[in-house]
Amino acid sequence: MAEAANVRQNLQNVPSIFEISASETLDNLIYPALSKIFDYFGLRLDFKLWGSLRIQEELSPLLTWLLQYLYLRKRASSFGESFYGLQRTVTTTGDLLNRRQQFASATLLTFMPYVERKLRTRITRHEDTSPWEQRLLSAFHAFHAAKAAHTFFYLVKYASNHSPIFRLLGLTLRYPSEPPKEDQWTYVVLKMLEVLAFFLQFVQWWYSNDQRRKVGGTLINPEAMPRKQLPKEVQQSLPQRGECPVCLLSIQTPTACSVSGYVFCWKCIVSHMKEHGTCPVTHYPISLDDLVRIYET
């Protein structure tokens, strides 16, 4: 079987789309894996760095970039590509990557998913997005469409690369013609990282199964929260049906507060939450995650 695999690599030096897709999936697991490591070891790194930025959210992409750049420097491939025995080469000459291509590859591998993840998180939380953020998200949609087209042309052997990024950098994926030359220290470190990838996949599987067992074994309704008696002046000022408790007008963009159950205008409840951090009616503490947009049909 090993001899047949070697013959295949010699006769056909082009990896299949399944190997490429698997390597991309493994690359995309680095960021959540680092976040899980921080949580598992109890590293209290989730505090504000500047504005809305949090140090854990910004440290993980930086470590991801360092890991990808290390692999691109030593093996001319990303972490996932090296795991599946692939290598990046120049499309026209077949040479390995130069420093500029290594830096650009590591940057695009890390910060494109980072920016897209940030934008999608803001949209999921129904936060207001600026026009340039909307245009940037549209650009990501166009990129994914272009990547799907490149993948199709790669499948029918009409294109030498599977992604617009590879086409932009003038690169393609191939099986290495010879094993990478690296010192003993580098070999040990990279092998430890590959073993860590197996370990992380096992931990993820074990954790998901453990959570499933816990949820399946304790399907008991939680106790009701103690009812807070509202002051008389608050009870008298409660709005009529269909009115926002804050502006006392007809509700626009209805948004429910999961803590109290009241429905407000989106702008009213967000403005009040940012200023006071509580529900306007019950004065229970709330956060942006407690607000649920209601889409009427």
Curated annotation (Swiss-Prot):
Keywords noted in UniProt:
Membrane, Metal-binding, Peroxisome, Protein transport, Transmembrane, Transmembrane helix, Transport, Ubl conjugation pathway, Zinc, Zinc-finger
SUPFAM superfamilies according to UniProt: RING/U-box (SSF57850)
Superkingdom of the source?
Answer: Eukaryota
Report whether Transport shows up as a keyword of the record.
yes
Which annotated residues bind Zn(2+)? 244, 247, 265, 268
**Protein name listed in UniProt:** Peroxisome assembly protein 12
Q: Subunit structure of this entry?
A: Component of the PEX2-PEX10-PEX12 retrotranslocation channel.
Q: Which CDD domains match?
A: mRING_PEX12 (cd16451)
Q: What membrane topology is annotated for this entry?
A: Multi-pass membrane protein
Q: What does this protein do?
A: Component of a retrotranslocation channel required for peroxisome organization by mediating export of the PEX5 receptor from peroxisomes to the cytosol, thereby promoting PEX5 recycling. The retrotranslocation channel is composed of PEX2, PEX10 and PEX12; each subunit contributing transmembrane segments that coassemble into an open channel that specifically allows the passage of PEX5 through the peroxisomal membrane. PEX12 also regulates PEX5 recycling by activating the E3 ubiquitin-protein ligase activity of PEX10.
User: Record's domain comment?
Assistant: The three subunits of the retrotranslocation channel (PEX2, PEX10 and PEX12) coassemble in the membrane into a channel with an open 10 Angstrom pore. The RING-type zinc-fingers that catalyze PEX5 receptor ubiquitination are positioned above the pore on the cytosolic side of the complex. The RING-type zinc-finger is degenerated and only coordinates one zinc ions, preventing E3 ubiquitin-protein ligase activity.
Recorded source organism is Drosophila melanogaster (Fruit fly)
Q: Name one Pfam family in it.
A: Pex2_Pex12
Question: Which residue ranges does the entry give as Cytoplasmic-facing topology?
Answer: 45-48, 120-124, 220-297
Family listed: Belongs to the pex2/pex10/pex12 family.
**Topology Peroxisomal matrix: residue spans:** 1-16, 74-98, 159-191
According to the UniProt entry, its GO molecular function terms are:
protein transmembrane transporter activity; ubiquitin protein ligase activity; ubiquitin-protein transferase activity; zinc ion binding
Which biological processes are named by the entry's GO terms? Answer: peroxisome organization; protein import into peroxisome matrix; protein import into peroxisome matrix, receptor recycling; protein monoubiquitination; protein polyubiquitination
Gene Ontology terms, cellular component aspect? Answer: peroxisomal importomer complex; peroxisomal membrane; peroxisome
